């Protein structure tokens, strides 16, 4: 989306319209210019300070102040994309479509990206927002045939430049969410069609707990981490996230909620934590749970770096101690997710 800052996106991983073809944003960094704790400025790349380069690919702001990114660019003219809104009677077909995309379509056509979100929209009730993007100026490519066959109540898809399409994506939330309070949460699972239905049904079963709160607009999204994305993560020695093609395809369940009254925060947080707990329990029972937590969607009650796996955490800590022996960025730099301190707030509602 247009308001997202590039540095944080890249340091936390970075999912884009092009991830199915090229990997995440962190996998397409040629080099980082970093001011280390000692004041030494280094350029980390696959051939220089390679250990620091690896750590910065998903390790967040734990290793220094990144002052410059050099990214591997590629030519892009116009592309196609946008979003379509579907009513509740289409939910089974929408879930079938994202399942087929995650397991089959995304491997056959790496130019494609697809995210499905669910919410209660004022005046419309239960809706599914399907965001589809294609890295060519081709409308309704065959990889999206299952979605193309459905009849939306709103369709703003079209051909345009990347900047136009990212601005258009902001239309996925009510206009009055600007200035609201906001919280995001996520969890990851093996792609499973039954779990898709379970998480959507769980979300709507709990909506009454928050639907009457002032300005409340919660959503839940299914974002596939495709075979192409997982393969792209292995470039240049791999990243720090601990994900491999053997673990896929997987998907991120991303939940967000905007609201306007600070007094409602506890209710909103309890609503989201309850969904997480219920879906995690169901996924574990089905054998499709995955520990990974995407840093850029994580709440303050989560520890994304721990989800990278014990070996990667140990390696990240080693890199941190090498370039920051006094642990300035672990102990004096406030905020965000540290390497081995757990969730910023360990008291999940």
Residue locations for each model-derived region?
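Soluble FAD-dependent oxygen oxidases
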Residues: 1-349
């Amino acid at each position: 989306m247009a308001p997202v800052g590039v540095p944080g996106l890249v340091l936390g991983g970075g999912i884009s319209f092009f991830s199915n073809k090229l990997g995440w944003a962190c996998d397409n960094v040629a080099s980082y210019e970093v001011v280390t704790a000692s004041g030494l400025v280094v350029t980390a790349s696959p051939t220089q300070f390679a250990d620091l380069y690896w750590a910065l690919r998903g390790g967040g702001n734990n290793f220094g102040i990144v002052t410059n990114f050099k990214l591997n660019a590629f030519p892009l003219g116009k592309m196609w994309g946008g979003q379509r809104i579907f009513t509740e009677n289409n939910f089974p077909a929408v879930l079938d479509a994202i399942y087929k995309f995650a397991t089959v379509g995304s491997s056959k056509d790496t130019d494609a990206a697809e995210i499905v979100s669910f919410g209660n929209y004022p005046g419309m009730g239960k809706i599914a927002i399907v965001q589809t993007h294609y890295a060519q100026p081709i409308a309704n490519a065959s990889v999206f045939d299952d979605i193309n066959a459905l009849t939306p109540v709103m369709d703003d898809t079209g051909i345009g430049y990347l900047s136009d399409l990212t601005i258009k994506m902001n239309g996925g939330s009510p206009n009055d969410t600007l200035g609201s309070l906001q919280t995001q949460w996520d969890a990851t699972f093996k792609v499973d069609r039954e779990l898709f239905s379970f998480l959507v049904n769980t979300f709507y079963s709990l909506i009454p707990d928050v639907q009457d709160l002032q300005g409340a607009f919660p959503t839940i999204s299914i974002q596939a981490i495709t075979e192409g994305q997982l393969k792209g993560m292995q470039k240049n020695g791999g990243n720090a996230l601990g994900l491999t093609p053997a673990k896929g395809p997987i998907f991120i369940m991303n939940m967000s909620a905007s609201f306007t009254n600070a007094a409602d925060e506890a209710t909103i947080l309890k609503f989201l934590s309850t969904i997480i707990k219920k879906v995690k329990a169901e996924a574990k029972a089905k054998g499709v749970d995955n520990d990974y937590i995407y840093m850029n969607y994580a709440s303050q009650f989560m520890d994304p770096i721990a989800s990278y796996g014990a070996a990667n955490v140990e390696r990240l800590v080693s890199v941190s101690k090498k370039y920051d022996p006094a642990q300035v960025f672990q102990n004096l730099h406030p905020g965000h997710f540290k390497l081995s301190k757990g969730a910023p707030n360990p008291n999940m509602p």
